[in-house]
Amino acid sequence: MTDLREKKRTAFFRGHSAERFASVLLLLKGFRIVARRYRTRLGEIDLIARRGNLILIVEVKARSSLEAAHLAVTPQAMRRIEAAADLWLQRQPDHARLSLRFDLIAVLPRRWPKHVPAFFTSGNY
């Protein structure tokens, strides 16, 4: 196996592990996980969680520091996440009652994940 293929494979499994860890954090906070790795033609959402009428659109980043996790979410990624969230929301029968929030969960080495509520807002990148 080539080095590049091995790096991609490692990153893939690290990402899955980080998303599972982030899911546990959200469950402990009283959220229900509605979708994992929600894919559309416009983009992908790592996690969608719900508590009441609040919907969290969550980007999960496994990085060495909180700053590195912040920097890993580019304005282009934010636009794709928002576009995917809009498509998901349109498909919900109770979409008029729902409030969306775009959060970041940074999974850091040997620490509990850091939840950053309202990491970005719609249209503000």
Curated annotation (Swiss-Prot):
Organism: Brucella anthropi (strain ATCC 49188 / DSM 6882 / CCUG 24695 / JCM 21032 / LMG 3331 / NBRC 15819 / NCTC 12168 / Alc 37) (Ochrobactrum anthropi)
GO molecular function per UniProt: nucleic acid binding
Family: Belongs to the UPF0102 family.
Annotated protein name in UniProt: UPF0102 protein Oant_0187
InterPro entries hit by this protein: Restrct_endonuc-II-like, tRNA_endonuc-like_dom_sf, UPF0102_YraN-like
HAMAP family (alphabetical): UPF0102 (MF_00048)
Upper classification of the organism: Bacteria, Pseudomonadati, Pseudomonadota, Alphaproteobacteria, Hyphomicrobiales
Membrane-spanning ranges: none
Pfam families found in the cross-reference section: UPF0102
Cross-referenced Gene3D superfamilies: 3.40.1350.10
NCBIfam families documented for this protein: PRK12497.1-5
Disulphide bridges: none
Domain of life: Bacteria
